[in-house]
Amino acid sequence: MNQNEHPFAFPETKLPLTSNQNWQLSTQRQRTEKKSITNFTYQEFDYENISRDTLERCLTTIIKHHPIFGAKLSDDFYLHFPSKTHIETFAVNDLSNALKQDIDKQLADTRSAVTKSRSQAIISIMFSILPKNIIRLHVRFNSVVVDNPSVTLFFEQLTQLLSGSPLSFLNQEQTISAYNHKVNNELLSVDLESARWNEYILTLPSSANLPTICEPEKLDETDITRRCITLSQRKWQQLVTVSKKHNVTPEITLASIFSTVLSLWGHQKYLMMRFDITKINDYTGIIGQFTEPLLVGMSGFEQSFLSLVKNNQKKFEEAYHYDVKVPVFQCVNKLSNISDSHRYPANITFSSELLNTNHSKKAVWGCRQSANTWLSLHAVIEQEQLVLQWDSQDAIFPKDMIKDMLHSYTDLLDLLSQKDVNWAQPLPTLLPKHQESIRNKINQQGDLELTKELLHQRFFKNVESTPNALAIIHGQESLDYITLASYAKSCAGALTEAGVKSGDRVAVTMNKGIGQIVAVLGILYAGAIYVPVSLDQPQERRESIYQGAGINVILINESDSKNSPSNDLFFFLDWQTAIKSEPMRSPQDVAPSQPAYIIYTSGSTGTPKGVVISHQGALNTCIAINRRYQIGKNDRVLALSALHFDLSVYDIFGLLSAGGTIVLVSELERRDPIAWCQAIEEHNVTMWNSVPALFDMLLTYATCFNSIAPSKLRLTMLSGDWIGLDLPQRYRNYRVDGQFIAMGGATEASIWSNVFDVEKVPMEWRSIPYGYPLPRQQYRVVDDLGRDCPDWVAGELWIGGDGIALGYFDDELKTQAQFLHIDGHAWYRTGDMGCYWPDGTLEFLGRRDKQVKVGGYRIELGEIEVALNNIPGVQRAVAIAVGNKDKTLAAFIVMDSEQAPIVTAPLDAEEVQLLLNKQLPNYMVPKRIIFLETFPLTANGKVDHKALTRMTNREKKTSQSINKPIITASEDRVAKIWNDVLGPTELYKSSDFFLSGGDAYNAIEVVKRCHKAGYLIKLSMLYRYSTIEAFAIIMDRCRLAPQEEAEL
């Protein structure tokens, strides 16, 4: 390799890097310990009819002219300038006689080698000799040392030398050394603890929270993709003219279009953007790194582009002229320690070379890579046209996402550069057209006509055609269609005698059984509205619902002792008496659009809210499912869901409308897989419909006890919570041809609104997707500003169509807040988060508010907090849901100062739970109670919920706070079984199986061991009596009376 000596003597042997260079280099090294990534700018230019010798001579002249090219970047964060440096002879690849496909491959290989190189050389140059006397020049600059304007200067000076003009002499006083020392001295004067500096940092929003598919640190190597937008000279001048008319710079106009696009894909109104600003007025003609990054909080959405761009101009000027210099290196370090939202600060950049720059020559190819930049936009003028260079690390993002962002940017840029455009008009939608088209198509699928029938009508039609078919099986009892209809008509007659009129609300408060189905059919036949109110909640809460719903008559079971009235406001009618009444001869005439039922769900203010669903809304869902899966007279469903849980609506009316059979279990058997398996096998159940946790329990039990029950199920429908990725295969291990269906929706949208037939589960899936809307239902994914989110962007799921509830009963304010009417379409805001995949598939991403799903029940944490705060002595309480797959509730309590448990312990966890049981259903009472002196707070002064979650994994004063030792032989027997299953752990009388680490799998193993020891324990008993003390008593009773369910 021939070498030429570099004659330029630099005045210093080494030079400290600037803060910006330190940041770039340190970030690069953080990501290059095991990865292939460096900071560089790479350009390719073609030169025609110029000899190679001439080109080499001119390049050598430029390199000798600029001392930076003689430097070496070392590991000590200094630039070293050897006394004698050398210029390597440029590599040459002769392709002058190669075929086109070979040339294309060689050029691609060259680019790949150059861009993936980990060389720290300041400049690397090679030639490709192409046919037709063309030389392709490949130049790679180390961008830690050479900035974008310097790259431009390099090629301008090459053009100057090739034209025969000499280079100007460098100013020996304005050098790189002078610049670096000046910047570093300025940094020394910055007080990083000053209030003004911290004020600036803390007011910055996060960078655009773009969807990603991996963390940058996990990339094996980085490929940079450059995409370019070109705006004609005419349109560019129009954009400049309009910008100046509104007193904004063209740079801020281009950056504001960028922030608008980033805002949509980042699901945020405000975002941080890094402007790479080069201050070179005093350093003209010098190649080096003069970039001073500036972090600016940009607006991404306003009512018009004019208000947005003017706002951003103001924000930029405030940041630029801020009275305290804000070094980016220190900014980034501080931001990354504030919160997770700043985990990757300053990773999106905007830069420009629009002033006094017009590249006479256009680059053939190029790209720019920085370890701390995921996406950059660089604006330049080439041959009088605006060229916008988008450089992105595509491997970080979902496929084609950056391309879609580029198209939206192009569309908005084209619109704003039109002649006579009005920037004060509302911003147009930027959702890519192809995405909009796919969503419109899937939201209009299906040919299902809106039903004009009532929810119960098809059942009574089936009575006429198949009167002797089995309608219900419950243990040894069964009812055929005609008998069930007879009971329902008599019940309707009894309700009429009790004064119930069409449109009245009638409560159903009884345990699971035949009576529930008789009751709801009878209520609907009488033209009334059924309101299921669970017995598994305090009487005070039940009566609050009765009063709120305007209920006078309550259908009960004669054996339910909990239904003793506390006053004479309500008339209690047991269904066994009701079916002995004179039957109602013909059904009450009701419009299909009128309410069929009201289901009360948890309310954030502490008061449950009643969801009002119409006949046609609910029946439309039932018909859609029945048609899709060909549900018919030979189908039987195991009905596990409680009546106040809307899966029961399909269990009852879906099957009875199709002529099928409902197989019931008792209230105590609803959590007992032994009973489920027996019912499935004995009664040939073909369908399963439940929350995922119950089906998981069925499969686990079947595997442990060698049951064939899952193989009987031709159709499994799961909804109401996350579905484990392993469930489809575990099910198909029993039945290869079984249909596994994932569903979702909201009580406010008639049972379900979406469906997905799960065939295979790809490795890359994070969860089972929601799928697609059911016929006559629609979905939108919407951000906080009401914009439809692009593919992969998380937003709130809105449901539209014929299943939408009529609102919340007697609560106009809540109805208006959740049910929106836009352009003639009704939408329900679910509070669930989701995103679209490019093919139109919906993915569920969890809740956005304080509402959670626990055991399939939708729970407002706010309602639990209201109940906790009602307890005397509680200063403040916070409830959270803990866990991913199997969530449990935990509550944190700060007592009034004079009643803090640390001092006087006036309350313990068990007392809190007893008090909550008087206000809330059992499933809403937290299993874990933790007392605190104060709540942990975030930097913004809010309760730190993540810190609370971490506390649940540490030993605190919890529901096991009173650790009474195990003393009886029975308790010791239980403790040994638990230790065998859970592993060695310290157990006490009050130790809770599930809080001690137990789950559904462990619970089944406990039951299995109990059976081997001669105790006929049911799984439901462990769920019901989950402490050592309670379970020991139950075990003893089961030993004495194995055929009976013992009661404490």
Curated annotation (Swiss-Prot):
In the induction comment, the record states: AngR transcription is regulated by iron.
Q: Does the keyword Iron apply?
A: yes
- Regions crossing the membrane: none
Share an example GO biological-process annotation for this protein.
iron ion transport
| Record's keyword terms, sorted | Activator, DNA-binding, Ion transport, Iron, Iron transport, Ligase, Plasmid, Transcription, Transcription regulation, Transport
* Outcome, altering residue 267 to L: Does not produce anguibactin, impairs ability to grow under iron-limited conditions and decreases virulence
**What is stated as this protein's family in its record?**
Belongs to the ATP-dependent AMP-binding enzyme family.
What is the recorded name of this protein? Anguibactin system regulator
Query: What taxonomic lineage is listed for the species of origin?
Result: Bacteria, Pseudomonadati, Pseudomonadota, Gammaproteobacteria, Vibrionales
